[in-house]
């Protein structure tokens, strides 16, 4: 199924098929614009360890390091036009990720929600699932293919379409906090939190459309630091990493740990 899988390695994973959401902003690294090659290498190595552990990995990438449609719409650009430009930015990032992944010997497929036949396959749900079953990393670009929808919503949608076990939101921080830990020394990290509390407290894990999609299908979400070595594999193997957002009424609503 995957690059190095055997029955023992795959059975040890808490999450077998995952949708990894990466922000375009995170690709900036120390730059003010564009793509930091060091960040690409880090992400490629993290995904490789996950695939080697037996996981099926699909990725949705944002485009905020290149173009943010919402911001330009606020400055006067037509919103739909700006959003389509943002979709193109996600494809640039998707191609960069594809190259980085292939440089560490991962087999990839880049799929686009809008037609770009020379550089990407069209998004076809059954084809994407088949790629995952064969151990290929599938990168989804161009968001949902529609304006007015964020790449977080694209991640929720694609995660549901490919029957992912969980949506993993890889960020530059260690999870969801009660306050900004860099500004508030008393800030605590949520170890786990019910999705309704995320909505009620407006914790901005994802936009409301994305959260609603996850809520309706009880799709769990984990917010974690993608830049910490082996975090992705540790998470897949069941270690407590980041913040787990769940929809299970039987679980404790929240659990916090010091930042």
UniProtKB/Swiss-Prot annotation:
Q: What is its EC number?
A: 2.7.4.22
The terms describing its cellular component in GO are:
cytoplasm
What GO molecular function annotation could you give as one example from this UniProt entry? Answer: UMP kinase activity
* Locations listed in the record: Cytoplasm
Report the record's Gene Ontology biological process terms.
'de novo' CTP biosynthetic process; UDP biosynthetic process
Which pathway does UniProt place it in? Pyrimidine metabolism; CTP biosynthesis via de novo pathway; UDP from UMP (UMPK route): step 1/1
Q: What is this protein called?
A: Uridylate kinase
Organism per entry: Salinibacter ruber (strain DSM 13855 / M31)
According to the entry, what is the taxonomic lineage of the organism? Bacteria, Pseudomonadati, Rhodothermota, Rhodothermia, Rhodothermales
């Amino acid at each position: 199924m995957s690059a190095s899988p055997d029955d023992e390695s795959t059975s040890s994973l808490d999450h077998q098929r995952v949708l990894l959401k990466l922000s375009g902003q995170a690709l900036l690294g120390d730059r003010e614009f564009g793509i930091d090659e060091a960040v690409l290498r880090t992400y490629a190595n993290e995904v490789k360890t996950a695939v080697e552990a037996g996981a099926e990995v699909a990725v949705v990438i944002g485009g905020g390091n290149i173009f943010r449609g919402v911001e330009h719409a606020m400055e006067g650009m037509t919103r739909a036009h700006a959003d389509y430009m943002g979709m193109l930015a996600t494809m640039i990032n998707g191609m960069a990720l594809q190259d980085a992944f292939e440089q560490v010997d991962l087999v990839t497929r880049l799929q686009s929600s809008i037609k770009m036949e020379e550089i990407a396959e069209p998004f076809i749900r059954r084809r994407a699932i088949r790629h995952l079953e064969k151990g290929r990393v599938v990168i989804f670009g161009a968001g949902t293919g529609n304006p007015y929808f964020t790449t977080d919503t694209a991640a929720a949608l694609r995660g549901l379409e490919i029957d992912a076990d969980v949506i993993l939101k890889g960020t530059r921080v260690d999870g969801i906090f009660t306050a900004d830990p860099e500004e508030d020394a008393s800030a605590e990290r949520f170890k786990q939190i019910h999705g309704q509390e995320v909505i009620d407290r407006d914790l901005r894990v994802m936009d409301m459309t994305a959260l609603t999609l996850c809520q309706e299908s009880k799709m769990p979400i984990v917010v974690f630091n993608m830049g910490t070595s082996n975090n992705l594999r540790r998470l897949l193997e069941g270690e407590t990493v980041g913040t787990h957002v769940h929809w299970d009424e039987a679980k404790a609503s929240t659990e916090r740990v010091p930042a």
